[in-house]
Amino acid sequence: MAGNFWQSSHYLQWILDKQDLLKERQKDLKFLSEEEYWKLQIFFTNVIQALGEHLKLRQQVIATATVYFKRFYARYSLKSIDPVLMAPTCVFLASKVEEFGVVSNTRLISAATSVLKTRFSYAFPKEFPYRMNHILECEFYLLELMDCCLIVYHPYRPLLQYVQDMGQEDMLLPLAWRIVNDTYRTDLCLLYPPFMIALACLHVACVVQQKDARQWFAELSVDMEKILEIIRVILKLYEQWKNFDERKEMATILSKMPKPKPPPNSEGEQGPNGSQNSSYSQS
């Protein structure tokens, strides 16, 4: 593990340029509007969150899984691997990397099947179509894409330090923590260092709680312009989220999403060859 964030693969390889990110996304934006793509981000983050909660994983494991998911689709089109397969794959890998312990094959498939059926049936009327061999193959592609750069830094630790330094832990921490969780529904984890995201979330929490922290922020040696950029993204998320009726909209958005070849049918799932490449696309 890197001794600190500035020497880590997270900083050196996975803080991306916004223009490069948008350029990579153009293939998908031929099929989806920017707003629809944003809603897909929110939706699949919700799927990963629900999977993690079902498996009783720590929030940091869920956050790491979400970052893996975003990293993959920052480099590849949604068409390359079905996000419905990628989501549990990211949870599976993150649980190992964050030393939570390996989630057993049976539990993982059971959780994915149950969560899609009970929480997201309005978007996925059919059964979860994948089995463990698909997840293991998908994990291989995910590891290859990330070049085995698996350590992810999160805003939670710096947030805790900042709130303690400010001396307002009880008032600010619960709200700022929830805002950090919400930032994973955006691109922020791909674009900014975690400590900046933590400061932006703390700033929003201070405004909401009417805590005057101008002096505390003024004494920081940090680029406040970047903090304000992050705050604008957070506020845009809440504005868009407020008007997002997931149950009504997601089926249509998912139908427009570029897809790999159709997932295996029930007869082909157990066969050694019938479903080998059905969740992947080379184009």
Swiss-Prot record:
Region named Disordered: 252-283
GO biological process: positive regulation of transcription by RNA polymerase II
Disulfide bonds: none
Keyword vocabulary terms for this entry: Activator, Cyclin, Nucleus, Repressor, Transcription, Transcription regulation
Primary location: nucleus
CDD domains the UniProt entry points to: CYCLIN_CCNC_rpt1, CYCLIN_CCNC_rpt2
Domain Cyclin N-terminal per the UniProt entry, residue ranges: 46-144
Cell membrane is among the record's keywords: no
Any Pfam family the entry gives: Cyclin_C_2
An annotated GO cellular component: mediator complex
InterPro entries the record matches: Cyclin-like_dom, Cyclin-like_sf, Cyclin/Ssn8, Cyclin_C_2, Cyclin_N
Molecular function GO terms recorded: cyclin-dependent protein serine/threonine kinase regulator activity
Subcellular location: Nucleus
Polar residues composition-biased segments: 272-283
PANTHER family per record: CYCLIN
Protein family membership: Belongs to the cyclin family. Cyclin C subfamily.
Task performed by this protein: Component of the Mediator complex, a coactivator involved in regulated gene transcription of nearly all RNA polymerase II-dependent genes. Mediator functions as a bridge to convey information from gene-specific regulatory proteins to the basal RNA polymerase II transcription machinery. Mediator is recruited to promoters by direct interactions with regulatory proteins and serves as a scaffold for the assembly of a functional preinitiation complex with RNA polymerase II and the general transcription factors.
Subunit comment: Component of the Mediator complex. The cylin/CDK pair formed by CCNC/CDK8 also associates with the large subunit of RNA polymerase II.
Protein name: Cyclin-C
Organism of this sequence: Gallus gallus
Gene name for this UniProt entry: CCNC
